[in-house]
Amino acid sequence: MTNKKNIYPSGVFKCIIMVTLFLTTITVEAKKKATPATWPDGTVMDAWFTNKTKINPETLGRQYMVTDYGVNNDSTIVQTTALQKVIDKAAKEGGGVVVVPEGTFLTGALFFRQGTHLHIKQGGKLKGSDNIIDFPVLTTRIEGETCKYFPALINADGIDGSTITGNGTIDGNGLRYWQAFWTRRSWNAKCTNKDEQRPRLTYLSNCRNVTIQDVRLINSPFWTNHIYKSDHVRYLDCYIYAPTSGIYPPDPKRGAPSSDAIDIDACTDILVSGCYMNVCDDAVVLKGGKGTWADRDSTNGPCERILIEDCHYGTVHGCLTLGSESLHDRNIILRRCHTDNANRVLWLKMRLDTPQHYEYVTVEDITGYCRRFLFIHPWTQFFQKGDRDLPPSRCNNISMQRIKVETPDMFDVKPSDKYILDDFTFDGKPMTF
């Protein structure tokens, strides 16, 4: 009778076991890789969100070094006209990259055209004029409404495929604007953010397939980055900074007012990855419109499919803020981020004069220190209630998990009959307020 236990030598038997385990591991890993990433509502996330490939500006066409086309390497004169001529020349000749070399170049509002890109070399700086006259009034979008106001330092409208690259700096030169704002507030406490005339740093409207990578975006007089009615915009490894104190001698606690890092206004498919943000207001902010009839205004709109990941926050008012000028935000993810000193991590601003709906928001894998993690309160600043009976606003399907922050106040939530808070979970457990 054959002894079946000895059919295979022990070494061969061990080899079979190892091969079997190896193949099983490969199968399991393949299944894991085959599982597509999803948004909080279960819909599949497009592969575009996993593409962190940096843009090589040398592949984008002819390089237009600004100093080769009449721009002086002189930091004392405003050269808006000369710089704009280089941009327009590049556009007229089929597109290309406007290159800023080492040195400081003072300018007012610049307008990029289809096919043009901006590359700022290490040691190069575009510095904004501190005279508002260098920013001509036009129809633009600001604070949840389309109106006459000032453009940004860098502007693009209706462009497909633009980039801002390089290890250089776009400096808003905001000190005089900040001090003028706080001086106005000292005698008119009710003045709005727009009352003191200030430009933003960058403004993209009606754009798509845009990448902003590696640049330093600092000292904006107003919002730092504002994108409106745009899609498929990537912010990769940017440094975004405005001082949070020490800019106003009568009150040294004051910082750069309303210097939001990235304002996402009625946009879809936005990626913010690997960025550092330290500003004297909110960091990533979702906007879309305000007012009693905001949902009937075609210039407004929702924010959907917004991914913020692997970012580092210094001092900010809110890491991720929905509102106050927001209508409908859906499928929003904040993950794998660290905060040094955020006032709040997730801030849901409930504006009582605006119909709002925030849904399918996930915050996960957050570390560091914050004064408050989740903050939900009515927002009544500049209240503009109109003649309309509004239904309650709503926040639902808000998920928080694997949160490892130090904080004296994890949840600061104020219920109201003006909004409904539903389907909140923390590490999978239901929350009630």
Predicted segments, located by residue:
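Extracellular "leader-to-stem" segments immediately downstream of a signal peptide or signal-anchor
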Residues: 2-4, 11, 15, 19-20, ...
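Short charge-dense sequence patches
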Residues: 32-41, 186, 282, 310-318, ...
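Electropositive phosphate-/nucleotide-binding environments in soluble metabolic enzymes
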Residues: 77-80, 302, 394
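Glycine-rich beta-solenoid repeat tracts in large extracellular/virion proteins
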Residues: 109-112, 125, 129-130, 152-157, ...
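Right-handed parallel beta-helix
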Residues: 122-123, 160-169, 208-219, 231-245, ...
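Short coil/turn motifs at beta-sheet boundaries
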Residues: 147, 195, 356, 391-393
